[in-house]
A protein has these predicted regions:
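Hydrophobic residues within membrane-embedded alpha helices
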Residues: 11-12, 228
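Cap/insert and terminal regions of metallo-dependent hydrolase folds
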Residues: 195-276
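Binuclear metal-dependent hydrolase catalytic cores
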Residues: 2-9, 15-190, 199, 256-276
Length: 276
């Protein structure tokens, strides 16, 4: 895609033309857990792998149309994740929950504020956590140069629009912590889920593409699904294709691990783009 150089009066920034004619494009910016892959101090085959699909930054994603760009979570690898991406305005930043691996890169959205304030959406608990953890971003008189963020508290099932994309929050449980997944038409994005209440399931009817967390093959975890649980959940809601994210090095080498999954279930990897 050809890029054009434009000069902003306040900042010199590189812009990219929108994604004309491509519909919605979903990019996996990161597919790893809080440790990422490779894991510091680990010398397993996955952590030593030269296959880029085995290298996983912290979980984050990008949903784009020709007119709109939405980022889901801004973890500590956000700057590195966005460097290969065209420089476009961020129309909305959706936060799933307050844990550091999902919000640690909030400050790195600053360059995008040259293109306009960024609207940030999260549940009330996460909004309070953001104000506490990043107070300099949300004061009445912010220091010059801090990110220009407008914080919005959102509720499960209450739809809203970001540009031309309709967003519906879905509540899931991260252990004992209520967090948000998001539905965009026939696409659902859910990470860090362990369980979901039955009353949430009707809001996932008709999902064709599911992105959902799957920590590892075995050894039960108190707040994350295993791969088997993620597949069971996919079957329960009737998704046509499922991409697993928030993965540890314990899944094994991508090339080999993928062969163990059903034909309609895929291990996502950093940089993977899908059309939805």
């Amino acid at each position: 895609m050809k890029q054009e150089e434009l000069i902003n009066n306040e900042h010199s920034v590189r812009h990219s033309p929108p994604l004309e004619g491509l519909g919605e494009v979903f990019t996996f910016l990161g597919t790893g857990t809080s440790n990422g892959v490779p894991v510091l101090g680990c010398s397993c085959d996955v952590c030593k792998s030269k296959d880029p699909r085995d290298n996983r930054l912290r979980t984050s994603a990008l949903l784009e149309t020709a007119k709109t760009r939405i980022v889901i979570d801004s973890g500590p690898d956000f700057r590195q994740q966005m460097l290969p991406q065209p420089f476009r305005k961020i129309d909305g930043l959706l936060i799933t929950h307050i844990h550091y691996d999902h919000v640690g890169g909030i400050d790195d959205v600053r360059p995008y504020c040259a293109l306009g304030d960024i609207e940030v959406y999260a549940n009330e608990n996460t909004c309070n956590g953001l104000r506490h953890n990043f107070p300099y971003c949300f004061t009445d008189n912010p220091y010059p140069g801090v990110p220009k963020l407008n914080l919005h508290s959102i509720q499960p099932h209450v739809k809203f629009m970001i540009g031309d994309i309709e967003v519906m929050p879905i509540e899931v449980m991260h252990g004992g912590l209520p967090i948000l997944g998001y539905r965009f038409g026939k696409l659902a994005y859910i990470t860090d889920m362990k369980t979901i209440k039955d009353e949430e399931l009707p809001y996932l009817e008709g999902i064709e593409t599911l992105v959902v967390n799957a920590l590892r093959w075995e050894r039960e975890h108190h707040s994350h699904q295993l791969i088997s649980e993620a597949i069971d959940f996919s079957r329960k809601i009737g998704a046509k294709r499922t991409y697993l994210t928030h993965l540890t090095h314990k899944i094994g080498l991508h090339e080999e691990a993928q062969k163990l999954l059903p034909n309609d279930v895929f291990f996502a990897y950093d940089g993977l783009k899908i059309h939805v």
